[in-house]
UniProtKB/Swiss-Prot annotation:
Its EC number is 6.2.1.5. GO terms for molecular function: ATP binding; magnesium ion binding; succinate-CoA ligase (ADP-forming) activity; succinate-CoA ligase (GDP-forming) activity. This is Succinate--CoA ligase [ADP-forming] subunit beta. Pfam families: ATP-grasp_2 (PF08442), Ligase_CoA (PF00549). SUPFAM superfamilies: Glutathione synthetase ATP-binding domain-like, Succinyl-CoA synthetase domains. It comes from Streptomyces griseus subsp. griseus (strain JCM 4626 / CBS 651.72 / NBRC 13350 / KCC S-0626 / ISP 5235). Binds 1 Mg(2+) ion per subunit. It catalyses: succinate + ATP + CoA = succinyl-CoA + ADP + phosphate; GTP + succinate + CoA = succinyl-CoA + GDP + phosphate. Residues 9-237 form the ATP-grasp domain.
Amino acid sequence: MDLFEYQARDLFAKHGVPVLAGEVIDTPEAAREATEKLGGKSVVKAQVKVGGRGKAGGVKLAADPDEAVARATDILGMDIKGHTVHKVMIAELSPEIEAEYYVSYLLDRTNRTFLAMASVQGGMDIEEVAEKTPEALAKVPVNAVDGVDIAKAREIVAQAKFPADVAEGVAEALVTLWDTFVAEDALLVEVNPLVKTKDGRILALDGKVSLDENADFRQPDHEALEDKDAANPLEAAAKAKNLNYVKLDGEVGIIGNGAGLVMSTLDVVAYAGENHGNVKPANFLDIGGGASAEVMANGLEIILGDPDVRSVFVNVFGGITACDEVANGIVQALALLESKGEKVEKPLVVRLDGNNAELGRKILSDANHPLVQRVDTMDGAADKAAELAAAAK
């Protein structure tokens, strides 16, 4: 989960990373009070999860509270690279800046370790630095057991060739940034720029944080950080039911068990769709191994609630997941939706194979629901689902 700048700033402050004061607001008039709290001057910064805010006009200085209101009025509702600005941060003006640096920690999947990155060339796109002057970007592996103490931080600073007059201050910031990375179960923490001010302070002026959602079970506070405005309502509903769901731009709803099978199903449906009006998969939904009838019912309810879906393909190979449980889930979901007065009109194509497949097929046959069609091969079922979706367009 990627955070907004103001959320990253709050986490930095929580763990001792030096930051400037700031407040997030969502109405122009609130900018007045927030600026007054900061002494009458501020920086108004659009809160979007994309770079290039400054060039897009999403970062403006305000010399007084009235100007802060005007700037907030201009920025709220702005579109920046497809992201609508719903909030702005009213931030304290930085003291005069003498130098800008870059520091970060991230998960290095290739080498199966953590990586510290640091550069004396901050305030710009770090990918550009890595491409044009790779020698200016130090990359230092970090052992997960040892972590980053002040000695390790000094090693990072030395490899990045920070000037002697800021070396200790940057090292101390690196220690607190590592504390943030570990304590918050982050995949990335980045400060760009980390600045040295004329009065000698080291400050984190802007930052990025990406959190590992797999650690949500031990990070209850992270739920409050979710972006409710940007969340797809179907994805939000699926997450609330602990379903692995991703909305796609298509017409055939997909339900399967196991990520590999679901990915294969997407491919097969996309291929079949070429012969049926170029219909495509509408989603990724993995109900997982050992899914119960309740999980199946929850998944089907999400899929049928998608207005883009014209047909549904349920593709299950029973291993830990028993096909009779899947069949019961389908029957229960349809009955539940109809009991709520919801008109279910989207046809379902079901392919069951493996554990208790015959029993699952019998359950569907006995239910004899007019919208459910059984097809016993994956290719045949994909073709039928694509055909039905095309006919309903």
